[in-house]
Amino acid sequence: ARGAGLLSQDWSAVEDLLAQMSLPEADAQREAEVVSVATGGRLNLESVDPPNNIPLRERKAGCKNFYWKGFTSC
C-alpha cells in the first residue's frame, strides 16, 4: 500500500510536468514568473556555450586536405 502511494505521487508529478510543458508560451511565461516569485527570484541556470563557438576548421573532423595556399573546404 505504501509503495502504491509513492507511485501515485510520482505519476502526479509527471502529470504536472507534462501539463506545464503543454501550456502555451504566454502561460508558461506566467508560470515561470510565479515560480520565480515563489523561489525568491533566485534561479540557478548553467550557462551553455553555443555550439558554433569552435572554428569551422576544427568542427569538420575529417577535413585534413591542405593546398599550398591554405586548407581546402571539405
Curated annotation (Swiss-Prot):
Disulfide bonds join 63-74. It is found in: Secreted. Pfam families: Somatostatin. Its main location: secreted. It comes from the Eukaryota. Keywords: Cleavage on pair of basic residues, Disulfide bond, Hormone, Secreted. One of its GO terms (biological process) is regulation of cell migration. One of its GO terms (molecular function) is hormone activity. Residues 1-46 form a propeptide. GO terms for cellular component: extracellular space. Belongs to the somatostatin family. Somatostatin inhibits the release of somatotropin. PANTHER family: SOMATOSTATIN (PTHR10558), SOMATOSTATIN 1, TANDEM DUPLICATE 2 (PTHR10558:SF6). This is Somatostatin-2. It comes from Myoxocephalus scorpius (Shorthorn sculpin). The lineage of its organism: Eukaryota, Metazoa, Chordata, Craniata, Vertebrata. The gene is sst2.
